[in-house]
Amino acid sequence: MSLFDHSVSELHKKLNNKEISVTDLVEESYKRIADVEDNVKAFLTLDEENARAKAKELDAKIGAEDNGLLFGMPIGVKDNIVTNGLRTTCASKMLANFDPIYDATVVQKLKAADTITIGKLNMDEFAMGSSNENSGFYATKNPWNLDYVPGGSSGGSAAAVAAGEVLFSLGSDTGGSIRQPAAYCGVVGLKPTYGRVSRYGLVAFASSLDQIGPITRTVEDNAYLLQAISGIDRMDATSANVEVGNYLAGLTGDVKGLRIAVPKEYLGEGVGEEARESVLAALKVLEGMGATWEEVSLPHSKYALATYYLLSSSEASANLSRFDGVRYGVRSDNVNNLLDLYKNTRSEGFGDEVKRRIMLGTFALSSGYYDAYYKKAQQVRTLIKNDFENVFANYDVIIGPTTPTPAFKVGEKVDDPMTMYANDILTIPVNLAGVPAISVPCGFGANNMPLGLQIIGKHFDEATIYRVAHAFEQATDYHTKKASL
C-alpha cells in the first residue's frame, strides 16, 4: 500500500505520531516516479536535490504545534506556474531553458505551508490543448491506459496524481484544463471562482479566463489545498477581496434540501450516452440523500465554444507577443535583421497549435474584424454569464458531465482541431462566466476509462460545491479506484 493511498489528514497524523517522516513521503514520490515515469511522462523537471534537503530540514520539526495539515506533503506544479530557480518551460521550446527569478504567489503560499515541490509537470504548450499532445517535448499518457490521452492542458498534473507519483498537484484552467484531465484520469479537480486564487506568476494564456486550482485524489484533500492557496494578493489586481472561509466545515455529507439544476443542453446533442447515464445515476444518489433536481436551460451555451476560442485566442495573441527573442527565452540563430529576429524566433519557438491560436486571435483583433468577432464574442460572454445568474437565482448548484465522453486514444483527434476543441464544450461556459466548478469521478465508460461529474457553483461559493462533491464521494466508491499501472 502506497503512502499516497492515505489522505492528507491521515498522513499528517502519522507524521505527528512519528510513524513516518517527511523523507519517507519524498522518497515514496521519487520511487514511484522511477517506476512509472518512463511510461506516464507526467514530469518535465524534477527537483530531487532541493526536495530531499527540504525533507531533512522538516524532519527536525516533526511534532511541532505550528505544523499545518500540508506540512511535508509532496506536490507537483504545472510548468506554467513560475518557480524560483526551477526550470519553467510552459512545455514550449520557446522557454526550454528558462529559470525564473521569483515564485508565483501560490508557490510562495505552499512553501509557507511547508509543502515540498517534487517537480514541474507536463502540459500542452502554453496551456493550449485538450490532450497533452501539444507539449513541445513529449506527450503525457493516461495512467489508466497508456494508449489514451490524460486530457489537457493540465494532463501532467492529473496523470501524476492518478499514477501515485505525488499526493496532489496544481494545474491551471482556462477552458476546462483542470476539470477535463481530472475527469479523464479519475481524480478530483477544481477550477475556483475567477479571482479566488492569485494569478501572479502564472504565465498568461488568456488573462480574463485563467485560474490556478488543485488536483487531488479526494474532495477533502482538494479543500485543504484550495484553502492554502486562496485569498487576495496585492501582486494581482484581479484577485478578489472576498473572505475565503473554512471549506472543510461543510464536508458533512449532508445535502438534504439542496436544489440542483441540470441543464438540458448538458445532456443533449454531442454528449455521449455513457456520460449522460453516469450523471443521471449520480443524481439518483444525491436525490436519495435528500437533494432535489430539476431540468433547466442555459440557452446561450451553444455559442460558448466559438465565443471562447475568439476571446482566448485574442488574449493569447497579445500575451504571447512578449516572446520575441529579445528579453528572454529562445532566440533564433537565423537572423539578418530585427524583423528576422522576431519572425524566426517565434516560428521556431512556438508549436503549431500555439501559432494557430495566435493567428486566430490576431485576425479577431484586426481593425476590419474587431466589431464582428471580438466585440460580438464579449457580448455573447455577457449573455452566457447572465444565463448562469438566472439559474442560480433559484438553485444551489448546477450538475452535468465534465466531458462528453471518456478519454480518447492518443493520436485520435490531434489532426482535427475542431473535434479536439469540442472536448471542452461542457467546461468552457464555466470559465466564460467566472464561476467555480469541480470534477469528481462518477463512473467508467465501456473502454474502462473514468468519467467525471461536474458540479458548478455560484461566484465564490466553493464551499457548496465541495459539500455536494464530498457527499457524493462518500456515498460512492469511485474515488477509491486506482489505475493499475
Curated annotation (Swiss-Prot):
List the PANTHER family hit by this protein, alphabetically: GLUTAMYL-TRNA(GLN) AMIDOTRANSFERASE SUBUNIT A, TRANSAMIDASE
Q: What class of enzyme is it?
A: ligase
Q: Which SUPFAM superfamilies does the entry link to?
A: Amidase signature (AS) enzymes
InterPro entries assigned = Amidase (IPR000120), Amidase_CS (IPR020556), Amidase_dom (IPR023631), AS_sf (IPR036928), GatA (IPR004412)
Gene Ontology biological process? translation
| Complex and partners | Heterotrimer of A, B and C subunits.
- Tell me the NCBIfam families matching this sequence: gatA (TIGR00132)
One GO cellular component term, please give it: glutamyl-tRNA(Gln) amidotransferase complex
Quote the EC number.
6.3.5.7
Give an example GO molecular function: glutaminyl-tRNA synthase (glutamine-hydrolyzing) activity
User: What's its job?
Assistant: Allows the formation of correctly charged Gln-tRNA(Gln) through the transamidation of misacylated Glu-tRNA(Gln) in organisms which lack glutaminyl-tRNA synthetase. The reaction takes place in the presence of glutamine and ATP through an activated gamma-phospho-Glu-tRNA(Gln).
Name the family the entry cites.
Answer: Belongs to the amidase family. GatA subfamily.
Q: Any idea which residues are catalytic in this one? A: 78 (charge relay system), 153 (charge relay system), 177 (acyl-ester intermediate)
What's its catalytic activity? L-glutamyl-tRNA(Gln) + L-glutamine + ATP + H2O = L-glutaminyl-tRNA(Gln) + L-glutamate + ADP + phosphate + H(+)
The reply to whether Protein biosynthesis figures as a keyword in the UniProt entry is yes
Q: Which UniProt keywords apply?
A: ATP-binding, Ligase, Nucleotide-binding, Protein biosynthesis
This protein is called Glutamyl-tRNA(Gln) amidotransferase subunit A
